[in-house]
A protein has these predicted regions:
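Canonical Rossmann dinucleotide-binding motif of NAD(H)/NADP(H)-dependent dehydrogenases/reductases
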Residues: 2-34
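Conserved glycine-rich Rossmann-like NAD(P)H-binding loop of the short-chain dehydrogenase/reductase
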Residues: 29-45
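The beta1-alpha1 cofactor-binding region of Rossmann-like NAD(H)/NADP(H)-dependent oxidoreductases
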Residues: 40-41, 64-76, 110
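Substrate-binding pocket helix/loop in short-chain dehydrogenase/reductase
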Residues: 104-105, 112-114
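Active-site helix of classical SDR
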Residues: 128, 164, 168
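Residue(s) in the substrate-gating loop at a strand-loop-helix junction
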Residues: 148
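SDR active-site lid
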Residues: 185-257
Length: 309
């Protein structure tokens, strides 16, 4: 896809973070966008920001939708088509909506765990189920599913359980990769793109806590540390994603931490839950002193075992 101009995109979780940035950046390039969020006001705010940077004639609409609810996703589809007047196709679907929480399968309430999994996996599934027929009517449809580095490393570090989110993101990764072959056979003009962000400055922690009933002030204080320590902005992440989609990539790692984790886990799967080593990977110190951990080929320029130099 050489250009987003004149296309129609759907973005879930468009009320903040990467979703908001995707909406604005797509609109700025002349792409019509239907943005949804579980919070109507947040989606409306995003749409207003996007319209301010969009060329004349570019339509951006806001919709309320809980992606965990299949009926709401179907309603969102109908509203988007009606609002954009195209009637029969969508060119891009960004399944970006997500939530956190329910880290412990043992200690957290089952309903909280199931809610996180429902948003983070079933939300992606529902969007694929509802929008794929419309993507198939596009000349070059693209389904962009957001997983996470937690889709290949189910941890936040030692002593921090992270089961619901990680399980869902692993499921998104597997589902997306399986769809690649399915579509190659059944709809070869439609692409699936798997996005795996690392630590990005978004309000997912704050929004997730508020959704589970934590007072807003407390949620904002708890989420501020996550936001402030992120090495990559939501705007920077959206740029990486859109560049990857435009270039034809099927797998997009977002952030240097994502690249480091992916490289190390692939090279040393048995070390994935050795927290001394993984902490070094995340901090970047392993790349500085790989021999300390026996990672002789952590640097991409170093030949791997069995690889010619």
């Amino acid at each position: 896809m050489d250009s987003f101009a004149g296309k129609l995109a759907v973005v879930t979780g468009g009320g903040s973070g990467m979703g908001r940035e995707l909406v604005s950046k797509l609109a700025a390039q002349g792409c019509g966008v239907a943005a949804c969020d579980v919070r109507q006001a947040a989606a409306e705010e995003t749409a207003a920001l996007a319209r301010a940077v969009a060329p004349d004639g570019t339509r951006v609409t806001a919709h309320a939708c809980d992606v965990a609810d299949a009926a709401q996703v179907a309603r969102f589809r109908d509203e988007a088509l009606a609002a954009h007047g195209d009637g029969n196709h969508v060119d891009l679907v960004f399944s970006n909506a997500g939530t956190g929480g329910a880290g412990s399968f043992i200690n957290d309430p089952p309903e909280m765990w199931e809610r996180v999994f429902a948003v983070d996996f079933w939300g992606v599934y529902h969007c694929a189920r509802v929008f794929l027929p419309l993507l198939m009517k596009s000349t070059e449809g693209v389904l962009v599913n957001t997983s996470s580095v937690n889709g290949f490393w189910a941890s936040l570090g030692a002593g921090i359980p992270h089961t619901a989110y990680s399980a869902a993101k692993f499921a998104v990764k597997g589902f997306s990769e399986a769809l690649i072959e399915d579509l190659r056979i059944s709809a070869p003009h439609v692409r699936v793109v798997l996005v795996m962000p690392g630590h990005v400055a978004t309000n997912i922690v704050t929004n997730s806590l508020i959704a589970f009933g934590v007072p807003e002030k407390d949620a904002m204080e708890a989420g501020q540390g996550f936001y402030d320590t992120a090495p990559l902005s939501a705007s920077g992440a959206a740029d990486v994603i859109l560049d990857g989609v435009r270039s034809g990539a099927w797998r997009i790692l977002v952030g240097e931490d994502a690249h480091r984790l992916d490289q190390y886990v692939r090279a040393y799967p048995e070390d994935a839950y050795d927290y001394e080593k993984m902490s070094a990977v995340l901090s970047g110190s392993l790349a500085e002193d790989p021999a300390r951990f026996g990672a002789q080929w952590f640097d991409e320029d170093t030949p791997r075992p069995g690889q010619a130099s």
